[in-house]
Amino acid sequence: MPCVQLPAKESALFKRVLKCYEQKQYKNGLKFCKMILSNPKFAEHGETLAMKGLILNCLGKREEAYEFVRKGLRSDVRSHVCWHVYGLLQRSDKKYDEAIKCYRNALKLDKDNLQILRDLSLLQIQMRDLEGYRETRYQLLQLRPTQRASWIGYAIAYHLLKDYDTALKLLEEFRQTQQVPPNKIAYEYSELLLYQNQVMREANLFQESLEHIETYEKLICDKLLVEEIKGEMLLKLGRLKEASEVFRNLIDWNAENWCYYEGLEKALQLRSLDERLQLYEEVSKQHPRAVSPRRLPLSFAPGKKFRELMDKFLRPNFSKGCPPLFTTLKSLYCDTEKVSIIQELVTNYEASLKMNGYFSPYENGEKEPPTTLIWVQYFLAQHYDKLGQYFLALEYINAVIASTPTLIELFYMKAKIYKHMGNLKEAAQWMDEAQSLDTADRFINSKCAKYMLRANMIKEAEEMCSRFTREGTSAMENLNEMQCMWFETECISAYQRLGRYGDALKKCHEVERHFLEITDDQFDFHTYCMRKMTLRAYVGLLRLEDALRRHTFYFKAARSAIEIYLKLHDNPLTNDSKQQDIDSENLSAKEMKKMLSKQRRAQKKAKVEEERKHTERERQQKNQKKKREEEEEVTSGHKEELIPEKLERVDNPLEEAIKFLTPLKTLAAESIDTHLLAFEIYFRKGKFLLMLQSVKRAFAIESNNPWLHECLIKFSKSVSNHSNLPDIVSKVLAQEMKKIFVNKDLHSFNEDFLRHNATSLQHLLAGAKMMYFLDKSRQEKAIATATRLDETIKNKNVKTLIKVSEALLDGSFGNCSSQYEEYRKTCHSLLPLTPAFLPAAREALGLSAELNHTADHKLLMNEI
């Protein structure tokens, strides 16, 4: 329909509608819309209908909003306002591609509309359509050449496209238009100069960057950054003498920054050990209170010199009582010689302090305070824990606790030792003891909650966190609102271990939503950062958002989700009794009765908990409704409720798994787990070329990985079992597999793997599994290989030993209950306090293995 022109009265009302929308006076806006539309002549006025829809959307009436906007668009399809409003509606629903189409249609009708161009540019940078963003910013620059944002936005577009020369020309041209009072530092001008310099450095214009920073040094606020840039550029240009002076000045400013020492060493071109030691000795004399010049030489000093420096480093720290001392030195523990020297020094301190109160029996003068011995023994507990000598570590920590039962760090350390031993329940109890000494300490509270979750004590962990969450709401919901992802990822693992897959998936999807929210949250910064001239931070934000799902929290949640979906694909949950069938398969009548009684109690408890949650939900909904009424505004696009029962009964688990996998393949491609998880999905889908792609990528990262070895053999076996593959696919598979298997049959390939990794328990386990997989008659040989625990075997830690135990119970070696019992006894003799190897642990471990046996067999172990 043709555009209907409003007369003066209605036109004035329409302007008031626009004003009410801008000022968020939505009820008044609707009232004015009604006044226009109530006139029969203008009942179909497109722009008014569209604005009414936009206002309704702001009030949370999404369906009505779309109805009115579409009606308005049908009434006046040639109106740029209608298309613009439709775009705003799509944008509010996060349908950015559709919104861009609407804006482009609007611009066809009004190509110079500033507001539409601005909105379009925001969506283009949000979607990283950099070419389109550059064109739109160019149009804005032509229309508003006097506005700062026009120049800055256009320059940033070229910077992001890596056209540094054009970006620098634009920035310089804009800088010359800025009038800055002489001898006065303006923050925004300072940020512009620093951004300009950043572009120069990224363009490898080191000489220009140095000249630029020296020219405008007095106009820049961040003096420290100026010096850091100078030092970096002088190093790049080979002007080493000047660079060394800059880095010496930086060390005078901050003697604890390790990067400055690295820069100084490069500038001085120190080659010999003596020169390096002399440098740190000089700096240490100039800055006697600084730790870094005394700590850094410990990383490269050898033998006798290391002993001397370590002795000087340890004594003052023990005397004054420095809890993080061991953390400072932990990186040295990859060198066995240095570990031996540390152990000898500290044990000698302990013996001498006990005997005469000095660090050495040959000293005299003022004795060390009694607390020195406490810190020495605390250090020894950490030292032996790091070496895996848990009983010795417990001896020391118990001795210190007996003498000083009020020191939080001691209980914290004791909990840590039990965690490393695999006794997670005991670890949680001792961490609870630690937090009881200072209930106002948020760090120790969080640690306690984390340990409880590791011990599958989910309710207790929630109660622990509730001390620091908002009153009136459940801790779990409040932590979700606060995007507390460390808690949620730990919950995921706990639910997964307990076989509560629906709850685990709910948390996985909540973490996924957090990352979506973080991505959406950048929208407001596209205009804010240009207005405030925080350009370096803005570019940093854009780059962070591009790689957001590389974050460890997302990786953990995605990996767990994929593992659960694989499990659900292999063993679909058809009804509520399915899990009971799995649990009760091998139970006697007495055990069955006990289990049913336990289930009844659990159901009763769950019912009470559900009623509590229902009441809490109702109260929350009332509060939210009240809040909506007060604000007269509700965010549109309600999120779908995550119901655990629905999540664990999806129609196609593998497709759901792929949704979590896709970001990992792009952003976490350097992790072998990404490609092996991809293999497990494609293996179940029968996608041979994608399976090949996954194992090839994994092989390029770590060819000797135990999990990869299992995947390769399963892949090869699957290919040989499918003789009906297309010729071209078979040819490609044969050609590529030849490069990996080097013309060996699977048995020979597996034997070679076992021979080359004869001292690694993880590799022996993988090889033994594949031995049984390829030939069921070799069960005894396979079990003997996996359960080897002689002196030559490395990594005999709790993590790996439990892995072997689970493999003996989950069917990887068939039925082998007698061999499991024998292996359990052997492990129990090695680690008597680890619950997994106690005589009564078989049933629990067996259930755990059944519930948690996933594609990578690593879940429980990662928590220890």
UniProtKB/Swiss-Prot annotation:
TPR repeats: from-to residues: 46-79, 80-113, 148-184, 224-257, 374-407, 408-441, 485-514
Keyword terms, alphabetized: Repeat, TPR repeat
Cellular-component GO terms for this entry: cytosol; NatA complex
Segments of skewed composition (Basic residues): 595-605
Pfam entry (one): TPR_2
Record carries keyword Repeat: yes
Listed name of the protein: N-alpha-acetyltransferase 16, NatA auxiliary subunit
Physiological role: Auxillary subunit of the N-terminal acetyltransferase A (NatA) complex which displays alpha (N-terminal) acetyltransferase activity.
Bias (Basic and acidic residues): 606-621, 635-646
Region (Disordered): 594-646
Molecular function per GO: ribosome binding
Tissue specificity as recorded in UniProt: Highest levels in the kidney and testes. Moderate expression in the liver, thymus and skin.
Record SUPFAM superfamilies: TPR-like
UniProt key word Repeat: yes
Gene3D superfamilies linked to this entry: 1.25.40.1010, 1.25.40.1040
